[in-house]
A protein has these predicted regions:
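C-terminal regulatory/interaction regions
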Residues: 59, 63-129
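Metallo-beta-lactamase
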Residues: 1-44
Length: 129
């Protein structure tokens, strides 16, 4: 199994998401039943993978905000590239048996939506004094 954080518009809050995963893991579940999917085992491995991807999304996003504070269109374009690179690498590292190009093709909608969600989050926190 392979999972990744959803950062789709407009609800992405990395700290709240991280806290939710940590609360679930504190209960030491044997398995999970993600919405729209069946049972998954290997919960500790999946949680670690999920949190590592979340950390990467957050760090990359904050770096982009620092580099491009006033250029939302350029941030979105860069976010699409970063999200794509992160998700494709993560899927392949988890054993997905396809080429990087095919993984990118299969993840295209998720890449687009997650980049948009990251862009909304960065715009929101970029306005915060």
């Amino acid at each position: 199994a392979w999972i990744f954080p959803s950062t789709t518009p407009v609800q992405f809050e990395p700290e709240a998401l991280r806290s939710s995963v940590q609360r679930m893991m504190a209960m030491q579940p044997q398995c999970l039943y993600p919405t729209h999917f069946g049972r998954v085992d290997g919960v500790e491995r999946l949680a670690a993978q999920f949190l590592a991807t979340l950390d990467r999304f957050e760090a990359d996003g904050l770096a982009l905000l620092a580099r491009l504070p006033d250029d939302a269109p350029a941030r979105l374009a860069a976010l699409k590239e970063q999200v794509a690179a992160t998700l494709v690498a993560s899927a392949l590292a988890a054993g997905c048996p396809v080429s990087p190009a095919r993984a990118h093709e299969l993840l295209a909608l998720d890449i687009e939506l997650n980049a948009q969600g990251m862009a909304v989050w960065l715009s929101r926190i970029g306005r915060t004094p």
